[in-house]
Amino acid sequence: MFDVIVVGGGPTGLMLASELRLHGVDVVVLEKSAKPTEQSRGQGLHARSVEVMDQRGLLDRFLAVNEKFQVGGLFGGIMKAWPDRLDTAHPYGVATPQPVTERLLNERAVELRAEVRRGCEVVGLSQTEDGAGDGAGAGAKDGAGVTVELADGTRLRSRYLVGCDGGRSTVRKLLGVDFPGQPATVETLLGEMEVTEDPATIASVVDEVRKTQLRFGVAPSENGLYRVVVPADGVSEDRATEPTLDDFKQQLRAHAGTDFGVHSPRWLSRFGDASRQAERYRVGRVLLAGDAAHIHPPTGGQGLNLGVQDAFNLGWKLAAAVDGWAPDGLLDTYHAERHPVGARVVENTRAQITLLGTDPGATALRELFSKLMDFEEVNRYVTGMITAVDVRYDFGEGHELLGLRMRDVELKQSRLYELMHEGRGLLLDQTGRLSVAGWADRIDHVVDVSEELDVPAVLLRPDGHVAWVGEDQQDLLSQLPKWFGSPHHEAAV
C-alpha cells in the first residue's frame, strides 16, 4: 500500500511527487503515456514558479539549459517593459519548453526515489473514508484508503490519491466532480514542423498578419523546427483527434496567403478557449491539481505555472496528513487557497481572449488597454497577476505580509531561499529570543538578520507563505498549531 498515488506524470504530478518525497512519503506516479511528451505547449516559467524552483534548489538546473526573459504585462497579446518595484528577487521568467520542464522535474523526482510508472492507465477508482481526517493516523484505520484499477486489471491501493491527469481527467470523472464553465468558441492549431520558406520572408509575413490576427505565429523553435500557431476553421467535435498537416497548410494559406512550405511535422495539436473549474478540489482522500482542476485558454502562459504552484501548495499538507501531524482541516485549506487562484486565472484568460478578437470592438479595447498599461501601477498589477507573485491567501486579519509568499532576501549568512530547500517550515528570527521547541521536527529556527526585512520575526510555511509576523513568544505559540499541528509530546514548550 502506497502513501500516495499521483495520477499523471506531467509537470504538476512530478512536482507533487518531489514535494512528497522530500518528506519521506511513499509515492508512485502513474502516467498513461508510454513515453514523455514531445509537445512544447507550456513555454516557460513565470516569476513565481522561478521562485518555487529556487526554494527547492532547482533553479540552477533550469537556467543551465534555458534562457531568461523579461516581459511585463504579458496580457492579451500586449507586451510592456517589466514594471518597477515588483515584489520579487527574480524579476524574470525562464523560457522552458514543456518537455525540458518535464525532464528536469522527472529527474528530480527519481533522485528523491519517487517511483514513476509509464503506460499505466487508470480506469477505476474507489475509496473508503473511515477515519479520513487530516490528523494522526489518517488512512491507517479500518482499511481506509483509495483503490485504483488500471487498464491491464492491476489494482493498487494508497492512503491518498491526487489526480494530476489533465483537462480530460479520468480521476475527476470517476469522482463525479462537476466541471462547470464555458465551452470552446474558437480553436487554434499548434505544432512544430520544418519549413522551406526563407526566414526573413516568414518574419515579414507574420508581422503583417499579426496586425489583425494575434492568434497567428510562425517562429523558430529548436532543432531547426518552427513553432506554428494558426486559427482553426471552426471548433472540432473531438479535440482529442490530432489535426493533419493539410489542416495547417489550409489555414496558413487562408490567413497568410502561403503555407511557408511546412513539412515533416514533429507534433501537431489543437486547443480551444474553453474555461472550466472543478467545483471541489478534494473529495475524501482524493484531490485534484493542475489541469484536472481547471482549464482555460493558454493566453499569458499561466497553465503549467498554475499546476506547479498547486502542487507546491498541496505537497507539504498531504505529507503532514500522511505523517500524522496535520492539524484538523489542513488538507481543506488546499481548496480554500487554490480554488480562488484558479478562478482568477480562468477569469483573466477569458478577458485576454476578448482582447485577442479581430472585430473592431476588440481592436479598440486592445488599444485602450495598451495605453492603460503604460501606467506603472496598471502594469505592475497585471504583471503581478500573470506571474502570480501577488497571490495572497486569506489567513484573516493581521500584518500586511500575512498570507503573502515571502520574496527572497539576503541574510548575513545566506539567502532566505537557500534555507528552504528541504521543504520544512522556517522561523526567521531577527531577535534571537523566540523558540519553536516542540516543532523542531517540522520547523527550522534560523537566527539571522536582513537589511531587507523590517519585521522582528516571520514564520514561513513550507511553501514560503507568511503564517505569522511578530516578536511575542506567546503569540507565536498560539499560531504554530494552526499550520504545524501539536508539539512533539517529548519536547518542552
Regions found by a protein language model. Give the residues of each.
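Short, glycine-anchored, charge-dense loop/turn motifs used at functional sites
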Residues: A293, A457-A467
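C-terminal helical "tail/cap" subdomain of flavin- and related membrane-associated enzymes
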Residues: A320-G425, Q430-A440, V455-P456, A467-Q474, ...
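A glycine-rich beta-strand to alpha-helix segment
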Residues: L156-R157, P462-D463, E471
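Core Rossmann-like FAD-binding/catalytic domain of the broad FAD-dependent monooxygenase superfamily
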Residues: M1-R366, S370-M373, E377, V493
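Short, flexible beta-strand-to-coil junctions
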Residues: D429-R433, S450, R461-P462
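Short, internal strand/loop/helix patches
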Residues: V162, G438-V455
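Short, conserved active-site loop motifs that form the nucleotide-linked donor/cofactor pocket
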Residues: A114-E115, C120, V286, G425, ...
